[in-house]
């Protein structure tokens, strides 16, 4: 960055983390996650999200008892893959934790100063699998138009930014 640009935006090298949220196999909030972590609880157990009886491995660390309607309308939740629902729920908790619940009332000039940074192990593969099953069993007219976009790991950051009208950087870190 040039000296001239640095002078115009001197805060570009600093970040302030003001809130946090978590949806994990050991807790569906940052507080329950931390309590479980400190207590040494494991999130691993039998797979319940799908029939794993034909698989060699039947144990995973699944998120349990997650209800997306606690943080979004059912109509919105149906259009999202499960990992995006997790991202929106965790971001909602982070925004509330930071005391930014009035984010919708912010002036547009302030919304570009808020970055949305999401970390994920991958995209919504279950949406693509359901789309492939629908295509094979009933034909292309029954494939959701949301199936392919749901595969993108960046959908978490995109949907959080769209829900809250944030126009700052939307960044996705994807790592297995």
Where do the PLM segments sit?
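Short catalytic-loop micro-motif centered on adjacent basic/acidic residues
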Residues: 170-174
């Amino acid at each position: 960055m040039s000296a001239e640009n640095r002078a115009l935006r001197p805060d570009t090298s600093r970040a302030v983390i003001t809130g946090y949220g978590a949806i994990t196999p050991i807790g569906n909030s940052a507080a329950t996650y931390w309590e479980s972590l400190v207590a040494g609880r494991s999130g691993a157990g039998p797979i319940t999200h799908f029939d794993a009886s034909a698989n060699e491995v039947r144990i995973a660390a699944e998120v349990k008892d997650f209800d997306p309607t606690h943080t979004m309308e059912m109509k919105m939740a149906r259009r999202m893959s499960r990992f995006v629902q997790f991202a929106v729920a965790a971001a909602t908790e982070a925004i509330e934790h930071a005391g930014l619940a009035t984010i919708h009332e912010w002036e547009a000039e302030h919304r570009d100063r808020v970055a949305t940074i999401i970390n994920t192990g991958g995209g919504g593969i279950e949406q693509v699998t359901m789309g492939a099953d629908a295509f094979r069993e009933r034909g292309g007219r029954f494939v959701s138009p949301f199936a392919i976009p749901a595969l993108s790991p960046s959908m978490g950051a995109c949907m959080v930014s769209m829900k809250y009208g944030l126009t700052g950087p939307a960044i996705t870190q994807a790592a297995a």
